[in-house]
Amino acid sequence: MDLYDYMAPTTTTEEDDEEGYEKLKEEMGSALNNLTNGKFGLFWNSMKEKSENFLDDTKGKASSGMQQLKSQLEENIPVNSAMENLRKVEETAGSFWSGFGSTVNGFLDQALQISPKEDDVSTPTHEASSSVFLNRHERQLLELVQNENTFTQIISEPSHGITFESWEKEISIDGKTEEISLLLEEYPDLRKQMESLVPSEVSYDDFWKRFFWHKEVVQPIKAIQSGNDEEEIFSWGDERSDEEESDNEQVNDEKKQSSEEDTTENNSAAEVIDETVNDLESAVSKGLQIETQPASHDGEVDGEVKEEEENKVSSSSNIEASQSSLEVKDEANRKVDDDDEDDDDWE
């Protein structure tokens, strides 16, 4: 059976087409005639003419197509050959669209590929590198985050005399929204735990209350009981207190050292002043002794009187110098006392 015989039962004859066309034409003409009596008569008359022309044109094209199909079928072309040609056409079309799709996908992949910024290459994260240094409290926090029991296990036992029931009354999860956001951003494992457990196994409030209970109560107490140094006992707050204490101690040492140096210099100056005063007092003492000695010869009275007057002038000068030295000494001693008082006040 050829293709024409296969299609023949579903095709109509030319007589059937002619009869159907005439019938359709009559029905449309009747409908249009009824409409022309109304308000849109002119419009429908125009539509009627165009419809008749369209039907005539369609009829002609349909008849021409049927004639061509019949002529091709009458050439006795083998069905297998026709099917083979059809298969080749399908393969060619499939190959074309497959290659076209690959080309488009490759182009889109290149267009959508975004190079990472240079600033982002060296940014350390908890997921990117396992060599990131973790201090003690960060390691403990990771242990809490990765342990599912932290969030699912009901807390019934107190921790160092503190009960969970009394503690949770004083905590507000709504007040920790900002801290929770920072924790979720910094620790991806914590976000995974929340997405996995909330709300299927535990409520949102219970999830975070149990987490903060272990984070703020249990872990710090464990650190104290283990006998670790104060530096390793984390309070989850400001971690710069130890550094500030170290800086303060260093500043105190420097101040003490500077004060000791000032005291040494003041003592040295006081010793020098004492020696100078002693020399002046000795010189004054000698001058007074010369003044009180009696004359041994009458002929030498004028010379002795003159020498005595010179000695008085010298003694007077020495006394003034001694008084000035004593004033300098007193001033130095007052300065030393003031420095000592400042050191006592500072300590």
Swiss-Prot record:
Phosphoserine modification sites are S235, S241, S246
Composition skew (Low complexity), residue ranges: 313-325
One Pfam entry for this protein is BSD
| Location of this chain's protein in the cell | Cytoplasm
- The UniProt regions of compositional bias labelled Acidic residues, in chain numbering, are 240-251, 338-347
Q: Which UniProt keywords apply?
A: Cytoplasm, Phosphoprotein
Q: Where is this region: Disordered?
A: 229-347
User: Would the keyword Cytoplasm turn up in this protein's UniProt record?
Assistant: yes
Phosphothreonine is carried by which residues? T123, T125
Choose one Gene Ontology CC annotation of this protein and give it.
cytosol
> What are the residue boundaries of the BSD domain, all occurrences included?
167-219
Q: Does the keyword Cytoplasm apply?
A: yes
**Compositional bias per record (Basic and acidic residues), positions renumbered to this chain:** 297-312, 327-337
Q: Which PROSITE patterns match?
A: BSD
Checking PANTHER family in the record gives: BSD DOMAIN-CONTAINING PROTEIN 1 (PTHR16019:SF5), SYNAPSE-ASSOCIATED PROTEIN (PTHR16019)
Q: What is this protein called?
A: BSD domain-containing protein C22A12.14c
Originating species? Schizosaccharomyces pombe (strain 972 / ATCC 24843)
